[in-house]
C-alpha cells in the first residue's frame, strides 16, 4: 500500500473517530487486511455509514474487521447473501429435464419438462414443458 493511500485512509478515520488509540488500532487492522485496497475502502465506507446512522459500536466493528466479517459478510447483507447462495446452488446443480413424461396436444411424446418452485413453499411446483416437434411451450 502506498503512502498516499495510507494518508487518505487516516484522514477519513480522523474525521469520524476522536480517540487516537481507536484511530491507531483501526488503521493497523485495516492496513494488515490481506484482501486488498478495494476491500479496505469498502470497510471504511461501511464504518462511516454505520457511524452516520448511529449504529456503530466500535468494539463490534473491531471484532468484525479482525475476523474479516465486514462488508459482504455483515448481517446487513444477509438477504443478498441468501440470493447469491441460491444462484450459486442453481449453477452448481441445474434443473433436471425429463423427456416423455408429458404428451403434447400435437400428439408428440417428445416433450421436455422441468419443475421449478415459483410460488410460496406451501404451493406445488410449476412444471414447464416444451414440445420438440411443434415447439409449443406451456406451464402446468
Swiss-Prot record:
Record's keyword terms, sorted: Metal-binding, Zinc, Zinc-finger
Protein name (database record): Putative transcription elongation factor S-II-like protein 349L
Stored Gene3D superfamilies: 2.20.25.10
Residues where Zn(2+) binds: 104, 106, 131, 134
Similarity comment text for this entry: Belongs to the IIV-6 349L family.
InterPro entries recorded: Znf_TFIIS
GO molecular function ontology, one term from the record: nucleic acid binding
SMART domains hit by this protein: ZnF_C2C2 (SM00440)
PROSITE patterns: ZF_TFIIS_2
An annotated GO BP: DNA-templated transcription
Zinc finger (TFIIS-type) boundaries: 100-139
